[in-house]
Amino acid sequence: MTGSVSGEEGLSEKAYRLGVEYEKRYHNCAFSTVKALSDALNLGWDWPIDKVYGLAGGVGLTGEGSCGALSGGALILTLLCSPEMRYESISREERYKVYGIVSELAKKFQMEYGGCTCRRVQEKVLGRSFNLWDPEEHEGFVKAGGHEDDKCPSVVGNSAKWVVEILSANNYFEDKRG
């Protein structure tokens, strides 16, 4: 990738746009975030993309865990920013560098949505949270616009955009230019 800040800004907007598009199409925040980033960054990954769907809706649709868009973004940051070695071989300093990078994404969720859980994000963007396991509640989520542009798709778009911005701020693209 040739590198200019404007190119990286273009990548963040592409990641946002793909995140919105994919969440509207697939109705899965974790999958859509990882796929948007894989496609925007030309990672060429099939795995782990197809294996993250269980993280959606606050992990297994419980609402209690991290927002799936946050989980998907955290996964990509960890995969791209970790040293090329097994966990057991990574030094404490290297692990804490990655923890710090991932925490930047969590802080953005806290600032924008008031927290990191699916419930908290739903409350912010939908005005209340929904039990996605209950058919009536799930229908209420859809009727409240859960899959419309300015709701969960925008959360996925923001997460994907923020990941690109965090990668840029941590010289990921500079390192790739060599």
Q: For each of these PLM feature ranges, what is it?
A:
Residues 71, 81-88:
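C-terminal catalytic subdomain
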Residues 35-39, 73-77, 90-178:
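Amphipathic alpha-helical interface segments
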Residues 16-24, 56-65, 92, 143-148:
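A short glycine/serine-rich beta->alpha loop
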Residues 61-75:
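Conserved phosphate/anionic-ligand binding catalytic regions in large, soluble enzymes, centered on
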Residues 1-25:
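Polybasic, low-complexity association/targeting segments
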Residues 29, 67, 118:
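Short cysteine clusters
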Residues 3-9, 37-55, 131-136:
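Acidic-glycine-rich active-site phosphate/pyrophosphate-binding loop
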